[in-house]
């Protein structure tokens, strides 16, 4: 299967291990990824607030590249996924904005037609690779690993954007855990916000917010946490020492990127998946 691939900014900077592990796992799964080196940031959520026309153009440009090549666009970041889906909807509903965006894209020989398909890597795994094929490809079952899923909010809300995720109470990561042999831990914070965008102005609030989620996961038996978003990973992993100080209790929960978890089950090593780049180390009983 051939896919246009958009890693986003974090996976090429603070979370380079996410980009590297995605490429490794994609090759193992037989996915061909076409990456657009000139692709820019989608604008996070901040550019939309101050320069909405730029927000539309940034995202439509990347969508237009994938359209030009006739490929679905695969993402590995929740916020990037939401931005693309927002722009698809906004331009479908506003013909004048659509025309202005195409006027801007014309200078580069691009045109956005509105036919773009966006797929987060999680959806590719469960919908395109599929449960049966994944089970066949597993070389090292993650038996004995009790893992909590942390979805974050941008991959589940607003529900109207998501055909795959049709509510806040989805179970896709838990289904994937089961396929890979791990046991899923249920807890209250699994679909809540990670506080990444709050941390820029109110870091203390973000630390308290997410510390509560991680403590709840650990209290319910989690030995590690898997997340499909690098922004969530950044907060859950790098702020964990501050959370421990705030909670006055140790957490020590390794935070694993989605493709790293899949890669372990496919037989790749922790070193190959660059798990040593994480702030919180983890030795997995597999």
Regions found by a protein language model. Name each.
Residues 1-286:
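Iron-sulfur cluster-binding electron-transfer modules in prokaryotic oxidoreductases
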């Amino acid at each position: 299967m051939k896919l246009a691939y958009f890693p986003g900014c974090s996976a090429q900077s603070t979370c380079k291990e996410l980009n590297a592990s995605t490429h490794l796992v994609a090759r193992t799964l037989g996915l061909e990824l076409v990456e657009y080196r000139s692709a820019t940031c989608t604008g996070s959520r901040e550019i939309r607030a101050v320069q909405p026309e730029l927000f539309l153009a940034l995202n439509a440009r990347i969508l237009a590249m994938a359209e030009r090549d006739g490929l679905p666009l695969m993402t590995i970041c929740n916020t990037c996924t939401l931005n693309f889906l927002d722009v698809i909807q906004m331009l479908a509903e506003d013909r004048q904005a659509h025309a202005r965006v195409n006027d801007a894209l014309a200078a580069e020989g691009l045109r956005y037609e509105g036919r773009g398909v966006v797929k987060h890597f999680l959806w590719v795994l469960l919908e395109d690779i599929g449960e049966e094929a994944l089970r066949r490809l597993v070389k090292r079952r993650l038996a004995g690993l009790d893992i909590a899923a942390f979805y974050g909010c941008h991959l589940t809300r607003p529900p109207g954007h998501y055909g795959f995720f049709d509510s806040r109470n989805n179970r896709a990561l838990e289904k994937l855990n089961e396929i890979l042999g791990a046991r899923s831990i249920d807890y209250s914070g699994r679909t809540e916000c990670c506080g990444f965008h709050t941390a820029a102005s109110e870091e203390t609030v973000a630390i308290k917010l997410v510390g509560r989620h991680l403590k709840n996961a650990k209290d319910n038996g989690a030995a590690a946490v898997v997340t499909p978003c690098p922004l969530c990973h950044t907060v859950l992993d790098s702020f964990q020492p501050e959370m421990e100080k705030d909670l006055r209790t140790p957490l020590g929960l390794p935070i694993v990127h989605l493709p790293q978890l899949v890669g372990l089950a496919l037989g790749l090593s922790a070193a190959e998946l660059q798990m040593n780049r994480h702030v919180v180390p983890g030795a997995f009983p597999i």
